[in-house]
Amino acid sequence: MKISAFDIRPGNILEYEKGLWRVLKTDFVKPGKGGAFVQVEMKNIETGTKSNTRFRSGEAMEKAVVEPRTMQYLYADATGYVFMDNENFEQLILSEDLLEGQTGYLLPNTEIQVNLHNERPIGVELPPVVILEVREAEPSIKGQTATGSYKSAQMETGITVMVPQFVNAGEKIRVNTVDGSYIDRA
């Protein structure tokens, strides 16, 4: 499916130079002299290389056809992270590279969206918020309750999240999967 250069948005998957590229950032530029163009920062899905490319206003790009599928995370082993398709119950193993540092938000039975291109996984989308249990938290400092101070806490999945002073080990909290920030108690 062809789209105009001005319709390219972050998150789009483009077929460009015989590869699949995920759009990270777009900037519309209208210089004082010359034609308008779109500056696009992209990442190659297969190789992981980044590219800054300039597309003229009249150019059309090929947008990749992506099929989203809801899958459930089961477990991790030496081969990778195992997911089950909710429609046909087939299992799919994804590598850590494909999950792009999002493994710290995966708990068994978490539903995520796996994006497929020609029946091949090209990326995942986590739910915007997950509930994690605090495994370890630094002790709170007495008298620090008036200020909005934070302390680091290790979650059950191994990631570290900055939490308010009143959060203790054993409590469940809601964490934003986009930036890894504390939202509130669960």
Swiss-Prot record:
The reply to whether Transcription figures as a keyword in the UniProt entry is: no
Q: Which parts of the chain are coiled coil?
A: none
* Pathway participation: Protein biosynthesis; polypeptide chain elongation
Taxonomically, the superkingdom here is Bacteria
| Broad class of the protein's primary localization | cytoplasm
A GO molecular function assigned to this protein is: translation elongation factor activity
BP GO annotations: peptide biosynthetic process
- Entry keyword set: Cytoplasm, Elongation factor, Hydroxylation, Protein biosynthesis
One Pfam family named in its UniProt record: EFP
Q: Residues bearing N6-(3,6-diaminohexanoyl)-5-hydroxylysine?
A: K33
Q: Which InterPro entries match?
A: Elong-fact-P_C, NA-bd_OB-fold, Rib_uL2_dom2, Transl_elong_fac_P/YeiP, Transl_elong_KOW-like, Transl_elong_P/YeiP_cen, Transl_elong_P/YeiP_CS, Transl_elongation_fac_P
Q: Spell out the subcellular localization from the entry.
A: Cytoplasm
For this record, the Gene Ontology CC terms, alphabetical, are: cytoplasm
Q: Does the keyword ATP-binding apply?
A: no
The record describes its post-translational modification as: May be beta-lysylated on the epsilon-amino group of Lys-33 by the combined action of EpmA and EpmB, and then hydroxylated on the C5 position of the same residue by EpmC (if this protein is present). Lysylation is critical for the stimulatory effect of EF-P on peptide-bond formation. The lysylation moiety may extend toward the peptidyltransferase center and stabilize the terminal 3-CCA end of the tRNA. Hydroxylation of the C5 position on Lys-33 may allow additional potential stabilizing hydrogen-bond interactions with the P-tRNA.
Name the NCBIfam families on file: efp (TIGR00038), PRK00529.1 (NF001810)
PANTHER family the record matches:
ELONGATION FACTOR P, TRANSLATION ELONGATION FACTOR KOW-LIKE DOMAIN-CONTAINING PROTEIN
Question: To which protein family does this belong?
Answer: Belongs to the elongation factor P family.
Per its database record, what is this protein's job? Involved in peptide bond synthesis. Alleviates ribosome stalling that occurs when 3 or more consecutive Pro residues or the sequence PPG is present in a protein, possibly by augmenting the peptidyl transferase activity of the ribosome. Modification of Lys-33 is required for alleviation.
Can you say what this protein is called?
Answer: Elongation factor P
User: Lineage of the source organism?
Assistant: Bacteria, Pseudomonadati, Pseudomonadota, Acidithiobacillia, Acidithiobacillales
What gene name is given for the protein in this entry? efp
